[in-house]
Amino acid sequence: MNLKMKSTMMTMMFLLSALAGCAGGDGAVDLDDSDGGYDYASNVDNHRMLMGDVCDIKDLSGAYDWDGVKDIYENGEYAEKSDGSYRTLMGFADAAGKNHAYDDYYGADGSWNDFVSAAIDGTGPFDGESDTVRDQAVEKGIQNGVMTAYAIHELNAAIIKAEAGNWGPDDAQHAWDEGWAFYHGPDDADADFDGCGPFATAAKRGGNFGTGDATNIATLAAMNDGLAALVAEDMQGVIDARDEVLKNVVIVYSQASVRYASKMTVDLDEANGDYDKHQAEGHAFFRVIEAYVADHTDGCYNMAVHKVFYTGDIDASTCDAFMWTQHNGEGDYMCYNTVTHQVSTDVTTETECDGYSAQLFQERYGAEKINEIYDLKNDGDTDADYEAHVRMYLQPVWDAFGITADDIGTLQ
């Protein structure tokens, strides 16, 4: 073989090697440029393919193949980068400094990884729990918790980039695209993974509550509006779009929290053996929104009647603002709060009205009560109407986000 032929063959081998190295990377994943009605401004194929990991984990978790789940969760499977490494679900879930509220709320970096890894390993709150409970926590925790956190992080990252003047398709628009990639996933024929993300959950909950595709339609519109605002360098438009996405996330996972609370009551009544399973599902679903809604669930405890008046987002001093008065000096007396302009119907006398005080402020009361319902160690109360309780605790949240009864719908 002469030198020229050797040189040619070595060059071909080098090129083939280089192409092989890109086989799993952004440029080599053959996806179209849109998903579910959203047209990407940039290449986020690698990010979209991460949803394939979620799909396979759901299958493995359902079969209680914890080693298989752990391998994909930690090492990745579909989202191979151009350098041969993989984007992984654990890599995001365990990362510090992400642009979402979960880690600050739970007081730990990588708070979603703490939850998911404990469920995979059967440790922490999942120590001694059944495979069924662990499966629900893993599936719901990854599909909904990790992927929603990832999406929110990217939308906020887009805003941060835009605030720094980096509005373009390589910067803020790229981050915004990533948000949809993680929320929706690819719907291509050869990579049909869009049934494994939060978007798919929203469709199911819409079916459960008679609201159809309302939340997904609103979320898609907000995503398209946000991208258009980035192109136009309209900061308020981007922020409004992000807030609309978050509002619809709250609707979806409020519906989920209500639904599985209702199932728990039925399970106890029928003694059908599904209580633990549905409790684990509700536990994971509420965790998706807890960090964003808990501050709207404060309350004031009344020492005289031993009840909590549910107020929404307040500070302790608001609990001192109850007074025994009449409306415009006429009619029956009532216990009126001069800050929230609410009337406590739990009390009927001035002495009882005086039972409220700042010292008895109940921070995040509603969120704590929901967590008590979904506590995996709680074996249930056959006399409790869990759906009614969860609805009551979430009502101030819905008021704060401008969420109506029609938005939530009626559980079918």
Predicted features, each with a name:
Residues A23-S34, H327-E330:
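Intrinsic-disorder/low-complexity linker and hinge segments
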